[in-house]
Amino acid sequence: MDLDTEKILKRFEDYISYNTQSDEENDQVYPSTPGQMVLARHLKEELEQLGLQEVSLDENGYVMATLPANGAEGSVVGFISHMDTSPDAPGGPIKSRVVHDYDGKDICLNKE
């Protein structure tokens, strides 16, 4: 299977463009900020466009979908991920930096 790395990178950069920073003051409500639900709606639409089945989004911002098996012998797999980011991290916009040919050494995030 060939991976379209440019398409994957574009999708990743799209996801990080959403401000999904959590609100510590609003910790009894899920999602805690409107931006989290905006990303959830976007993910739901994208999963539908990709042809997944049983795509749903609930009032708490949980996005679920089913990708049917393409073979009779495959194991069932589940992927779970947060869409929110820490209130201590910048909320956005986030600028990505792509490191090509990573050599395994430390990556300096800020030269200051």
Question: Where in this protein do the model-derived segments appear?
Answer:
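Short beta-strand-to-loop junctions in surface cap/lid or active-site-entrance loops
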Residues: 65-73
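Metal-centered catalytic cores of metalloenzymes
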Residues: 28-40, 55
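Short, well-structured beta-strand/strand-turn elements
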Residues: 53-61
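A structural signal for the main folded, soluble domain(s) of proteins
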Residues: 24, 54, 88-91
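Active-site metal-coordination/substrate-binding segment of hydrolases
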Residues: 73-112
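General structural feature for long, well-ordered alpha-helical segments within catalytic domains
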Residues: 4-12, 35, 39-43, 75
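N-terminal capping segment at the start of a domain
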Residues: 5-33
